[in-house]
C-alpha cells in the first residue's frame, strides 16, 4: 500500500457527505449477500464500507479491470468484503470473477454493465436473486435482451444520475484525467466527440470550456439536430476523424471507432473513451500494432513504418 492511501481515503470520506448520509439511512442489512460489479476506485470505498457497517456481506468484482485500485480492494477486504479483482486482470481472469461472484450465492446484485446478470441468465443453476441494481445505460441496453427473472432497479434514469453524473461529472473528470496524464491542454486542438447523449453533451461542453475547438459526430438524427441547436458543429465521423487532434468516444456501443477509422486519423491524435464500454474503440486492432508507452498511462501506436 502506498504511503498516502490512508490520507486520500480520509479525504474521500470527508468530502462525500451525501454518500455517508444515504448509507446511514439504510436499514439493517444482516442477511443480505450483495455481489457488486463496479469500478473499484477510491470513491467507491465509502459506499462499500458503509454497506459492510450495516451488516451486508459483500463480494466485489470489477466492471473494468483498468480502473481497479488495488489498495482500495485490499482495504475493503480488511474491512470484511470478499473480492476477486485487481488492476489489469486479463480477459480470462475477469470472466472467472463473474463465475466466482455467482458461486458465492448472492441474494442481491449491484452492477455497472450487467455482466453478472447476463452471466447468471446463461446458467440454469445460478443463485436465487431477490433484486438487482443497474447503474449504466450500457447495462440497461444489455438487459433489454435478457428478460431478467427478478426486479432490477434502473438508477441510471434517476434525475441526479442523469443530470449530474452523466451530464456533468463524466466529461469533467475525463478531461481532468487527460490534462494530468498528458500534461497538455485542449487549446488550439480540434476535439471530436463521438456521441451526443448526456455523457457526450457534458464531454463536449467541458472540452469547449477548456479551450478545445469541438466537433460532434452523432448518428441519431434527433440527437444530431439537438447538437446543432446547442451550437455545435455536427460532422460526419468518417471525414472528421482525419481532422481531429483529440477524439473522445461517448456512445456506450462497441466498435464505434473502428480499425478503418483509426487508419484515417492524423499523426499524433489522442484517442480516449469516456463511455462505459472500453471496446467503443477497436482496442484489439491497436494492440496488434507496434506500440510503446511514452508517458505513464499513455500508449503510442505505430500505424505505418
Regions found by a protein language model. Give the residues of each.
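Glycine/serine-rich phosphate-binding loop and adjoining beta1-alpha1 elements at the start
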Residues: 1-23, 29, 60-189
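Conserved beta-strand elements of the Class I
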Residues: 33-35, 192
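Gly/Ser/Thr-rich loops at beta-strand to alpha-helix junctions
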Residues: 37-44, 64-68, 114-116, 198-199
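Glycine-rich phosphate/diphosphate-binding loop of Rossmann-like nucleotide-binding domains
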Residues: 41-55, 61, 172, 176-254
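Generic hydrophobic/aromatic pocket-lining and core-packing "Φ" positions
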Residues: 48, 73, 98, 203-204, ...
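A short helix->loop->beta-strand "cap" motif at the edges of active sites that frequently abuts
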Residues: 54-57, 81, 125-129, 148-150, ...
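ADP-ribose/adenylate-binding Rossmann-like module
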Residues: 62, 108-112, 125-138, 263-303
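Rossmann-like NAD(P)-binding element
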Residues: 102-110, 232-280
